[in-house]
Design a protein with these regions (language model features):
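Positively charged n-region of N-terminal signal peptides that target proteins for export
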Residues: 1-6
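Bacterial N-terminal signal peptides
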Residues: 7-16
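Boundary at the C-terminal end of the N-terminal hydrophobic targeting segment
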Residues: 19-23
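Extracytoplasmic substrate-binding proteins
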Residues: 25, 35, 106, 116-194, ...
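A short, structured surface patch at a secondary-structure boundary
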Residues: 44-102, 106-111, 214
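Alpha-helical, coiled-coil/dimerization segments enriched in small aliphatic residues
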Residues: 74, 196-222
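Proline-aspartate-enriched helix->loop->beta-strand connector
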Residues: 88, 95-112, 127, 227-243
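A ligand-binding cleft/hinge motif common to bilobed small-molecule-binding domains
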Residues: 113-124, 240-263
Length: 265
């Protein structure tokens, strides 16, 4: 009963704040192609993805973050600046009560996760929901520019400088691999023997790096396989993707290595 009353009090406070805080806003297009109205200036942001936190850090607007997910909090080595921020729960299943208590101007979410319940719960409280994946290399520049546009001129300036730097290095890399034979590769998508497929950022990166990815026919962004499947494809290189700062990264690597060696032996 006390929890229900607490949530009701938060709801009333947030709705009152939303009513009194009406003011200037900007309209941006999110990854779903929707027009999203964002109050400006944006001072308080909750990010449901670690990639969102990373992009905000590139823009040097960590000061706007007021809440992150439990997953991001576990990556203290990668994100020491935000480790002390409140957790809003899991990225796919956030705690709406905690989010309402934090009173963000905007919540940053993936394109399709969490589902539409996010908008149903938060938009009546005056909290804008901005859906940007911020993971696919081909879409990342435009999505970062969209995010920077709500975080102010300095964020836009730093985003522009960042992509100019990326473009210079991309050009150099592409020149260096233009005449090289393409090595065959498979890439593991964080979890042991979960292979990255077309449409995933990791798959796209292997293509950009000049490799011939042997998972081009699986038809989905990632697929769980076994060690026999990997050895049948017989890649020259096997790329292990890890999460920086994650406590069990070494354990995941050991498990993958053991799976592959067990078949070879």
């Amino acid at each position: 009963m006390n929890r229900i009353l607490g949530w009701f009090a938060v709801l009333v406070l947030a709705m009152c704040s939303a009513t009194w805080a009406q003011g200037p806003e900007t309209v941006v297009t999110d990854s779903l192609g929707r027009s999203v109205h964002i109050p400006v200036p944006v001072r308080r942001v909750v990010s449901l993805s670690a990639s969102g936190v990373e992009c905000i850090r590139i823009m040097e607007r960590i000061d706007t973050l007021v809440g992150i997910t439990e997953h991001t909090k576990t990556r203290k080595a990668q994100f020491p600046e935000v480790a002390r921020l409140p957790s809003v729960g899991r990225g796919f299943m956030p705690n709406f009560e905690v989010i309402a208590e934090l009173r963000p101007d905007v919540i940053l979410a993936w394109k399709t996760n969490p589902g539409p319940e996010l908008e149903r719960q938060l938009e009546p409280l005056g909290i804008a929901v901005l859906r940007l994946d911020l993971t696919e290399p081909g879409k990342l520049p435009e999505e970062m520019r969209t995010l920077a546009s709500i975080l102010g001129p300095e964020a836009q300036k730093r985003t522009k400088a960042y992509w100019e730097w990326v473009a210079r290095w991309t050009e150099q890399i592409q020149k260096s691999i233009a005449v090289q034979p393409k090595p065959t590769v498979l890439a593991e998508h964080f979890t042991p023997l979960r292979i990255a497929g077309p449409g995933s950022g990791l798959y796209d990166l292997t293509q950009m790096a000049g490799a011939n990815n042997l998972a081009d026919d699986i038809g989905i962004r990632s697929m769980q396989v076994d060690s026999e499947w990997v050895l049948e494809r017989n890649p020259q290189f096997f790329v292990k993707s890890i999460l920086l700062g994650k406590r069990n990264a070494e354990e995941d690597t050991r498990r993958t290595d053991e799976c592959l060696r067990s078949v070879l032996e």
